[in-house]
């Protein structure tokens, strides 16, 4: 089977936005116009083609990024719909990693919102070119130029309109194209009757002003165009398009367009912009990787001629075909039924079948080429972030890094039957989502699940019930506290048991000191003259690592500590690895009195958006939750409060905010850093954990 679309005519794009900016609706319309859907599904009726998991339809938010393929004007457009809710940022990071370009959807009334900023930052990290689509132009309070202003103010991005709306709210009935100098008028709500006309007289002046600004902005990034512009020469439509494309693909410029996906206005023009301005796999830099043995850096170009290399970016469990592994092909060709090497794990895998996804239906294909996105059935050991490559030409593509979970809950199966199924369900779910962890607490025997926020864990429990038919009771959320040392000290650990028969003897002196934040635990051996034999030194390190897991104050993991073994003694007969392990853990316990241990708690960056009149109440509430207000600003007719609040104080905040603002306030939070807890709180935590 030969290639259906050339690499040049392929676009891999993501659609990213704040929750409720209308991202799923926009994707739906794209699928509708490219002939993939026969009936349009409305998100607020719960029938959207992209939101294919049951809970997504119920909550009206997108959770897993479904990868869909569509066709438009002789191009293949692969779309990854990414979630806009802050608890799912890992999904967004994961999809951005494999995209060549993205469409950032904004709500015309609110402009750039907190989650938009988070997603935008992630896209900048991965160097993803973007187009901005100002959606919901039909909504009350829609303001296109205000939205463009928020892109400059809040994202500091070089964004310029390449279109202007004709009218807004109920009056929104057309779009001015500044590049082609024409207008498109809509006569019906299905958006199928579009008339290309001259720019209406009353809009000409504004259009000229903004076209001038656009040309100036593009010319600043293109010397040749700058010369023409300064000499007063006419810049042709083709030259302007080429200039915008070049500046957009090099992530120096972001074109802004407008429309209303719900009213089917501007969607076809959005598709044209994707093809005109977002990069094909040939326009983005070759992917970098390393050779597994030597770690030497190499590049793989986007070409069918190169050896096969792909990155697995998502695992899903499908009720009909089992485990689906979504992957992006960076180079080469892959046929179904062939073998590949998972170079990250060093395992050989057989690709049973290759599927191309259309939101919730799928078609089986026999071959995928460079630049394609597809799903494989039959991979056993592959997880998110693994590289799949040709067995004869190994490479490891840079993998992705995921944040540690910040919140955990205990979960108990309701019956014996549920208990057996729960293990399977949890292992499948943690395979799909690297920020979700499940483990058994050694002391209590409880199963603990951990994730990125309350909504994240709610949805996991919900999926267990729906997909795996496991009923479970969920405990109160627990915060992932940590402990660390604030002072340095030299302490002794001595373990001696010599009562008849072979004894046990281990003796160490260890210097503990605080390490830099985020550096973790570092162990050094500074013993001179063999006072502790070489073979026992790893046991000292291992003994400390084991003991660190259960902390010294309240049983939370100890982090960011340096330990150096400086002295000790041993016994020819009675010393053993076990004895030195125990001696090391005794030294750690002895450090409590000397190293000033403290408890650390996760601090969340919280943004609350509220009407002005509730400002006082909300500020008071934030302070009562041990929060620090870090800034305020007016956003449209609302006030935004930015604060740093401990996670432990944020449980149930959604309910409190609703009642404080009669349901008119919204908030979002993301994990920011760990901070020392105040003494009074620390005492409470210690008491509670010791069961006093």
Curated annotation (Swiss-Prot):
Chief subcellular location: cytoplasm
Domain (tr-type G) ranges: 8-282
Source superkingdom: Bacteria
PROSITE patterns with a match to the protein in the record: G_TR_1 (PS00301), G_TR_2 (PS51722)
Listed GO biological process terms: ribosome disassembly
Entry-linked HAMAP family: EF_G_EF_2_B
Protein name: Elongation factor G
Organism: Bacillus mycoides (strain KBAB4) (Bacillus weihenstephanensis)
Lineage: Bacteria, Bacillati, Bacillota, Bacilli, Bacillales
């Amino acid at each position: 089977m030969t290639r259906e679309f050339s690499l040049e005519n392929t676009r891999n794009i993501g659609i990213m936005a704040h929750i409720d900016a209308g991202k799923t609706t926009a994707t739906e319309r794209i699928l509708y116009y490219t002939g993939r859907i026969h009936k349009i599904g409305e998100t607020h009726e719960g029938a959207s083609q992209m939101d294919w998991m049951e809970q997504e339809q119920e909550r009206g938010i997108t959770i897993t990024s479904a990868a869909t393929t569509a066709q438009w004007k002789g191009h293949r457009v692969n779309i990854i719909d990414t979630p806009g809710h802050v608890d799912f940022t890992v999904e967004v990071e994961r999809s951005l990693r494999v995209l060549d370009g993205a469409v950032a959807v904004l709500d015309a009334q609110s402009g750039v919102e907190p989650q938009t900023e988070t997603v935008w930052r992630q896209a900048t990290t991965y160097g993803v070119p973007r187009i901005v689509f100002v959606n919901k132009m039909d909504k009350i309070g829609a303001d296109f130029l205000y939205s463009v202003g928020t892109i400059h103010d809040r994202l500091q991005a070089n964004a310029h309109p390449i279109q202007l709306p004709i009218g807004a709210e109920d009056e929104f009935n057309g779009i001015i194209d500044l590049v082609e100098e024409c207008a498109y008028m809509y006569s019906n709500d299905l958006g199928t009757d579009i008339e290309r006309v001259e720019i209406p007289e009353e809009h000409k002046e504004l259009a000229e002003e903004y076209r001038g600004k656009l040309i100036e902005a593009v010319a600043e990034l293109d010397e040749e165009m700058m010369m023409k512009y300064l000499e007063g020469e006419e810049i042709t439509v083709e030259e302007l398009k080429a200039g915008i494309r070049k500046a957009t693909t090099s992530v120096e410029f972001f074109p802004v367009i407008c429309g209303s996906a719900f009213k089917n206005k501007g969607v076809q023009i959005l598709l044209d912009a994707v093809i005109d301005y977002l990069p094909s796999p040939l326009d983005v830099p070759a992917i970098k990787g390393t050779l597994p043995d030597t770690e030497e850096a190499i590049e793989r170009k986007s070409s069918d001629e190169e050896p096969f290399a792909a990155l697995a970016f998502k695992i899903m469990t499908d009720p009909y075909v089992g485990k689906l592994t979504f992957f992006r092909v960076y180079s080469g060709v892959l046929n179904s039924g062939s073998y590949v090497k998972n170079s990250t794990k060093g395992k050989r895998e057989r690709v049973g079948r290759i599927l191309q996804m259309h939101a919730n239906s799928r078609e089986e294909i026999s071959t995928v080429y460079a630049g394609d996105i597809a799903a494989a059935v039959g991979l056993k050991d592959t997880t998110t972030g693994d590289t799949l490559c040709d067995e004869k030409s190994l490479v490891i593509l840079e993998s992705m890094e995921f944040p540690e979970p910040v919140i955990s809950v205990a979960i108990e199966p309701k019956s014996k039957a549920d208990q057996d199924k729960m293990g399977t369900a949890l292992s499948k779910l943690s395979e799909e989502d690297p920020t979700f962890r499940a483990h058994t607490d050694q002391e209590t025997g409880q199963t603990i699940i951990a994730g990125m926020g309350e909504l994240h864990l709610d949805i996991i429990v919900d999926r267990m019930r729906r997909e795996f038919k496991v009923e479970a009771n969920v405990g109160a959320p627990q915060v992932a506290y940590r402990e660390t040392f604030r002072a340095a000290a030299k302490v002794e650990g001595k373990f001696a048991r010599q009562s008849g028969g072979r004894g046990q003897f281990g003796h160490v002196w260890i210097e503990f000191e605080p390490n830099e934040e985020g550096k973790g635990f570092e162990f050094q051996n500074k013993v001179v003259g063999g006072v502790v034999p070489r073979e026992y030194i790893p046991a000292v390190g291992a003994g400390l690592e084991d003991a660190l897991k259960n902390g010294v104050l309240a049983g939370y993991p100890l982090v960011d500590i340096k330990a150096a073994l400086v002295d000790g003694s041993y016994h020819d007969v009675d010393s053993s690895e076990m004895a030195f392990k125990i001696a090391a853990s005794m030294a750690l316990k002895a450090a409590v009195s000397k190293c000033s241990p403290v408890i650390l708690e996760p601090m969340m960056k919280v943004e609350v958006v509220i009407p002005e009149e509730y400002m006082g109440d909300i500020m008071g509430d934030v302070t009562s939750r041990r929060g620090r207000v870090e800034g305020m600003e007016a956003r449209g007719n609302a006030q935004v409060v930015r604060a740093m609040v401990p996670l432990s104080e944020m449980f149930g905040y959604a309910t409190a905010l609703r009642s404080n603002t009669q349901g008119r306030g919204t908030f979002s939070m993301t994990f920011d850093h760990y901070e020392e807890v105040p003494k009074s709180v620390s005492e409470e935590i210690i008491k509670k954990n010791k069961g006093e």
